[in-house]
Amino acid sequence: MGVRLAGKVAIITGSGQGIGRATAIAFAAEGATVIVATRTAAHGEETLRRITAAGGNAVLRQVDIGDHAATRALVDEIAATCGRLDIIVHNAAAFGRKTIEEMDHETLDRLFNVNVKACFTLAQAALPHMRKQGGGRFLVTSSVTGPKVSMPGSGAYATSKAAVTGFIHTAAIELAADNITVNAIEPGYIDTPGLAGLKARFGEDRIAHFIPAKRLGRPEEIAGPMVFLASDEASYITGETIVVDGGARLPESPVFAG
């Protein structure tokens, strides 16, 4: 067990699988008490099992992050029960593929509710607790889709993740005086359940061919930077969005991807 997050309490949304699960496991391995917050209890139970089997500390809370009253209640409950709240990782996300012509407001509302509005809800709920104890960390799993690149059919998702960048910059400025840092990771093609649709449509080998690293990323390769940003080592880093994509966004054209 590591000590980089020893004594810290962290709520990680969407931690039932994929990047969220890997982040929860990594945080617990560094000494944090992890609140596994997930909408699907069975997924969260598996994350909890893996953490406890490795000797880590974690509790499971089933919550729909799109339910803002429930989200606020979760933050207040954990702060009261644990006596502190050091880290929020908003990893939960909503997805949807529709062209601009096909787009409907129900899809827009669903994606923005989880991907953007929940950032505000979590920050508003956590701020009094973090301010009282003298600081904290607020982290978001964003995406390269929107802030850096896009693709057909990703309009709602890309726009929501671009909005996350605006949130990160503004929140970093507003919360810096309270010793609360605000940062995001922008993953590229990471081998998670969320990538299943693209893998089925194009094939993993074809996707990997256009990535300079020639492979998909692993969830653990997002969890590592998350641990760093949550640690004391990153105390002077705020307002940053760090791309982790194996260089996928860099070629001028797929022709130059190698």
Residue ranges of predicted features:
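C-terminal helical subdomain
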Residues: 177, 184, 205-237, 244-246
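Substrate-binding pocket helix/loop in short-chain dehydrogenase/reductase
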Residues: 99-100, 107-112, 207
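The beta1-alpha1 cofactor-binding region of Rossmann-like NAD(H)/NADP(H)-dependent oxidoreductases
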Residues: 41, 63-73, 105, 220-221
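Alpha-helical segment proximal to the catalytic Tyr-Lys
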Residues: 128, 173-174, 235
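Active-site loop-to-helix junction immediately N-terminal to the catalytic Tyr of the SDR YXXXK motif
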Residues: 103, 149-158, 170, 255-256
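Active-site helix of classical SDR
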Residues: 123, 160, 168
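Conserved glycine-rich cofactor-binding loop
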Residues: 9, 16-17, 40
